[in-house]
């Protein structure tokens, strides 16, 4: 197929760098965030005030990381740099100053791709969306149905302050959800006189009742107010004026305890129209008075005062890596501060040095904890390049300081008008996290305050000005403008054609003439996320199916020979580039050398630039990362050009699946309920074959009886089984292995007690000591096979860090080729997913008029009820493109080029294709898009014409090989003695409540009895049954299930006198069957206790 790509519609602009969110945030942390924290942290003085320790934050430096990225991955190390900062210790008494550079901990560094390497695993820090600090006004209905208003001042850290009104028009204040306090008591405690307050209010008459109420309570002075405040906030402690002052100061006016943050100060100034300087981060009197004034205006329903919508994106901000890390550094430094103060007090003042005072451990621990176990630090989804890119652009409302799944209501999860162009309305998980985890829209960026902005073209007198740079607006600013959508039709000069344009204004829709339009959206794609923007004809799909399509593209397995989609959207190349999976040249020049492992580019000055390619690396999801050169020696390359394809890339574009010939028709019931019928060609031609790399690991540990040994000499193993092992007992690279084969031979010393009786007998007779070790080798698990790709040996002598108690670690990487098979899951890009039900020989598949058999047969009933008609457009456009020998790019939302444009374009392409020589049969004007197929088995034509075409189909990561599982015998749960569940534990199938009903309904009493006893948790019964089967005797009657005994014990532990009795009323001892020699009952009965204790004198 030729690589010429026809662009049906032109996208307005290129997308911005898609991983900028991560990189820019980390850069800010290194340049500003870290310095800010170190500066806020110093000086630290001891309790006497004699010594002072200053951190000179701007002079911190990072050392070169010990390992580079690849080395860190290989050694299971962290890609991190050591932080040093200059400290100054000042002795106030002697004036002596000691300056020293001190090590304060290790900081993991971000790789170029926006990820972190922690303990050898690639991780991503997900962006968090939280409520912005600031002041919020809300209304509530009290129990009498009267509307009351309240105002909350929410800081970045510190106590919340909430003002509220009651039915008597009194103003109250709560600090951190404590008891209500009269608002005027707080004013007086802050040192404000009645006049100070009244002068600042526009409607003081409303506030008068609060002043009178405070006077009635006898709180007339600042001291009394402070005492009252202390009583309310610290009930039970003896109040004092100084205590009240101290409390008030520490709660609201101490920068270490209370911080509005830059954002909080900006939001409060904006809402209350104040001019407090940016660097004042604590509460001011002005803030409090203006809040009260605004609240009174709301109560009196005076214009200009408005309520806040907490789900509006103007009131929610994004915390990216840099800020999350900054918060964590603050936690670490606070822990460090306590240690420094203690050491200052304990140590000898004269001989102390900064290095002795500063212990890096608390800071290291805090950073480690964040990267290792925070909810926002996630193991990177590396299934394919798109999954990686989407993961870095994910925005989560969960995590520390955010919401929890259980508490989040519908309002938070819902799509809000302010999401337009900022968060994708389509891409979100299905299930409990729906709406809490979102994806950043394609053109969106995060501004310095953490609010999401999106770009627009300015419109001047009805003409779209595309000459200058686009204007980025946050949600707050956009509300004040009239914004037209991106698919507005314009003439070639940029003048808007229509007389009335639909615009969004203050979260509503209205129609206005062109000269009233302020801005036009940059591109139709800017509303949706990256994954969604790869769906062609998206506008013809129902949102639920588009959501599934977006999510399933992230689960596509990279194939052996990827193929770009015939019908794309034009964003494929940018996704591949920004994912970091394809190497890109940074200079103009000529390719001077190419092989499978490296590409060398010589620039115009004759300098050589080396690009090393990844070969068959294992990804986090066990898929294969591999890069293939696409340039030849002598090629001219320009800066930014792609040099090699990564996994799931072809020609520098993302290629998640294959273009296959699809027919929509039922076939013998094999595509009932979304099942998929596929041709054998998919297997034989390796269309959907993927490479998976499994990692197996074994440790040789130090045991009580001596060290474990990795060796070739394994007891009771045939020489044949050791064929592929080297002299150390480790498998050779390139060997083919099946399940059960030994990968690494290991023997463990065993103690006297471990020996079976026959060995003891041999010893007693011959006095010879059989080698007392047992086989503990690493073997290939059940259902797995493949070829050994790599072996890595880690020992302490080589300088590797090993887990405690281990002397040696061996890792074996086994690659396997997985062809497509029955039970694998496949999907298109429109949420049309299914499981393969049968693989049919290609001669039996329905075939086209020219004799070509189709590759896949899908059920036509999968389209109408699901309303994802985009798949039909893609099918026919793909059919036309394949026959025209070209590829097509279709931008979503194409009605700006005319009504019903998708329809017309597809039809025009089909007509064009049928004009090619010998292709007249491709398009039938009487039945457009359908062809008469013949049955491969009989050669007879089918009754009706069938929709046929080329579609891009993906193989998803839910492979049957990873899920299929069977158990004959295996491990049991200790308490209930029932088989464990799940493949990993070699578990059994659960026979649940409903399955029991089914057997009861059929009256299959004996089957049911043995399922609930012998086959499950009747311990004695199952042993007896096994013996009976081995000896060929009839199976004895089942006994009591263990779980019933557990239930009895639990009821007895609650103090219930409960037992099991026969018809005659004799108690049955349930524990009898475990130890037949035990005569005492399982719980004390009057008979067993004897009556001697209870006999009367």
Curated annotation (Swiss-Prot):
InterPro entries: DNA-dir_RNA_pol_bsu_ext_1_sf (IPR042107), DNA-dir_RNA_pol_bsu_external_1 (IPR019462), DNA-dir_RNA_pol_su2 (IPR015712), DNA-dir_RNAP_su2_dom (IPR007120), DNA-dir_RNAP_su2_hyb_sf (IPR037033), RNA_pol_bsu_bac (IPR010243), RNA_pol_bsu_CS (IPR007121), RNA_pol_bsu_protrusion (IPR007644). The keyword Transferase applies. Its EC number is 2.7.7.6. It comes from the Bacteria. It catalyses: RNA(n) + a ribonucleoside 5'-triphosphate = RNA(n+1) + diphosphate. Coiled coil: none annotated. Residues 1077-1091 have a biased composition (Polar residues). In cyanobacteria the RNAP catalytic core is composed of 2 alpha, 1 beta, 1 beta', 1 gamma and 1 omega subunit. When a sigma factor is associated with the core the holoenzyme is formed, which can initiate transcription. This is DNA-directed RNA polymerase subunit beta. It comes from Prochlorococcus marinus (strain MIT 9301).
């Amino acid at each position: 197929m030729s690589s010429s790509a026809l662009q049906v519609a032109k996208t307005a602009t290129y997308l911005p760098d898609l991983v900028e969110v991560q990189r820019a945030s980390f850069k800010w942390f290194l340049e500003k965030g870290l310095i800010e924290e170190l500066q806020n942290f110093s000086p630290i003085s001891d309790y006497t005030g004699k010594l002072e320790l200053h951190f000179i934050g701007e002079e911190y430096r990072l050392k070169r990381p010990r390992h580079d990225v690849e080395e860190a991955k290989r050694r299971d190390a962290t890609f991190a740099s050591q932080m040093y900062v200059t400290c100054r210790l000042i002795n106030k008494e002697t004036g002596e100053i000691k300056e020293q550079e001190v090590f304060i901990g290790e900081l993991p560094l971000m790789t170029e791709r926006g990820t972190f390497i922690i303990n050898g695993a690639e991780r991503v820090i997900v962006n968090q969306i939280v409520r912005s600090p600031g002041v919020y006004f809300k209304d509530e209905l009290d129990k009498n149905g009267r509307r009351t208003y309240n105002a909350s001042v929410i800081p970045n850290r510190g106590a919340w302050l909430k003002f509220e009104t009651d039915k008597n028009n009194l103003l109250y204040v709560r600090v951190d959800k404590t008891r209500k306090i009269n608002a005027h008591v707080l004013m007086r405690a802050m040192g404000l006189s009645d006049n100070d307050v009244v002068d600042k209010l526009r409607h003081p008459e409303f506030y008068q009742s609060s002043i009178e109420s405070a006077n009635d309570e006898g709180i007339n002075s600042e001291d009394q107010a402070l005492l009252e405040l202390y009583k309310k906030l610290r009930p039970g402690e003896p109040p004092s004026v100084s205590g009240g002052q101290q409390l008030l100061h520490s709660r609201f006016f101490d920068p270490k305890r209370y911080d509005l943050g830059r954002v909080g100060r900006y939001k409060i100034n904006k809402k209350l129209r104040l001019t407090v300087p940016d660097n004042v981060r604590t509460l001011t009197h002005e803030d409090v008075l203006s809040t009260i004034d605004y609240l009174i205006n709301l109560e009196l329903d005076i214009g200009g005062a408005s309520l806040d919508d907490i789900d509006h994106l103007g009131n929610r901000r994004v915390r990216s890596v840099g800020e999350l890390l900054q918060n964590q550094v603050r936690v670490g430094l606070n822990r460090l501060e306590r240690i420094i103060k203690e050491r200052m007090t304990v140590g000898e003042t004269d001989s102390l040095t900064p290095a002795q005072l500063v212990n890096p451990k608390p800071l290291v621990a805090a950073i480690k904890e964040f990267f290792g176990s925070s909810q926002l630090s996630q193991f990177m989804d590396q299934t394919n390049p798109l999954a990686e890119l989407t993961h870095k652009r994910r925005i989560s409302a969960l995590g520390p300081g955010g919401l929890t799944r259980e508490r989040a209501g519908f309002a938070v999860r819902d799509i809000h008008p302010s999401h337009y162009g900022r968060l994708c309305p389509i891409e979100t998980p299905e299930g409990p996290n729906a709406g809490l985890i979102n994806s950043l829209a394609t053109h969106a960026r995060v501004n310095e305050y953490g609010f999401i902005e999106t770009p627009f073209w300015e419109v001047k007198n009805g003409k779209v000005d595309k000459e200058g740079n686009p204007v980025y607006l946050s949600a707050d600013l956009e509300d004040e403008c009239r914004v037209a959508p991106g698919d507005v039709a314009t003439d070639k000069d940029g003048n808007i054609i229509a007389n009335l344009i639909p615009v969004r204004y203050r979260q509503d829709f209205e129609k206005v003439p062109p000269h009233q339009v302020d801005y036009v959206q940059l591109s139709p794609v800017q509303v949706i996320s990256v994954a969604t923007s790869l769906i062609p004809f998206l506008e013809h799909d129902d949102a639920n199916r588009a959501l599934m399509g977006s999510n399933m593209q992230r689960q596509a397995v990279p194939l052996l020979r990827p193929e770009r989609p015939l019908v794309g959207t034009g964003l494929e190349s940018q996704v591949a580039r920004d994912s970091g999976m394809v190497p890109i040249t940074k200079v103009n020049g000529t390719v001077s050398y190419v092989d499978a492992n490296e590409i060398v580019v010589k620039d115009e000055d004759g300098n050589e630039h080396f690009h090393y390619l990844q070969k068959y690396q294992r990804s986090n999801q066990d898929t294969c990362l591999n890069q293939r050169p696409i340039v030849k020696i002598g090629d001219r390359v320009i800066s930014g050009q792609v040099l090699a394809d990564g996994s799931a890339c072809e020609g520098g574009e993302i290629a998640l699946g294959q273009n296959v010939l699809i027919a929509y028709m039922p076939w013998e019931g094999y595509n009932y309920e979304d099942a998929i019928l596929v041709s054998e060609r998919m297997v034989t031609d390796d269309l959907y074959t993927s490479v998976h790399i499994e990692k197996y690991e074994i440790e040789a540990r130090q045991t009580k009886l001596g060290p474990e040994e990795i060796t070739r000499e394994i007891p009771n193993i045939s020489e044949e089984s050791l064929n592929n092992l080297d002299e150390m007992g480790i498998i050779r690279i390139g060997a083919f292995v099946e399940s059960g084969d030994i990968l690494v031979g290991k023997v463990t010393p065993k103690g006297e007690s471990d020996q079976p009786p026959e060995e003891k007998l041999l010893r007693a007779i011959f006095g010879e000591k059989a080698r007392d070790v047992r086989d503990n080798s690493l073997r290939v698990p059940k259902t797995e096979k493949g070829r050994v790709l790599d072996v890595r040996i880690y020992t302490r002598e080589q300088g590797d860090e090993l887990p405690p108690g281990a002397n040696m670690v061996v890792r074996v990487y086994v690659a396997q080729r997985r062809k497509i098979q029955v039970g694998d899951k496949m999907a298109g890009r429109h949420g049309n997913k299914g499981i393969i039900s049968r693989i049919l020989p290609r001669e039996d598949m329905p075939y086209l008029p020219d004799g070509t058999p189709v590759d896949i047969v899908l059920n036509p009933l999968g389209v109408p009820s699901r309303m994802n008609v985009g798949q039909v457009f893609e099918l026919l456009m793909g059919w036309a493109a394949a026959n025209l020998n070209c590829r097509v790019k279709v931008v979503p939302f194409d009605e700006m080029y005319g009504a019903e444009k998708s329809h017309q374009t597809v039809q025009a392409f089909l007509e064009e294709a049928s004009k090619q020589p010998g292709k007249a049969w491709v398009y039938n004007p009487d039945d457009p898009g359908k062809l008469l197929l013949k049955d491969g088995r009989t050669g007879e034509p089918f009754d009706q014409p069938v929709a046929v075409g080329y579609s891009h189909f993906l193989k998803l990561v839910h492979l049957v090989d990873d899920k299929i599982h069977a158990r004959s015998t295996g491990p049991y749960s200790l308490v209930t003695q029932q088989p464990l569940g799940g493949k990993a534990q070699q578990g059994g199938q659960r026979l649940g409540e409903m399955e029991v009903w089914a057997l009861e309904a059929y009256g299959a009493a004996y089957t049911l009895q043995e399922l609930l006893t012998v086959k499950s948790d009747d311990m004695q019964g199952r042993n007896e049954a096994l013996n009976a089967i081995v000896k060929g005797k009839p199976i004895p009657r089942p006994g009591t299930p263990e779980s019933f005994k557990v239930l009895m014990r639990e009821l007895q532990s609650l103090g219930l006198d409960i037992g099991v009795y026969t018809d005659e009323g004799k108690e049955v001892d349930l524990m009898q069957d475990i130890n037949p020699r035990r005569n005492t009952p399982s719980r004390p009965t009057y008979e067993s206790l004897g009556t001697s204790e209870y006999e009367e004198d």
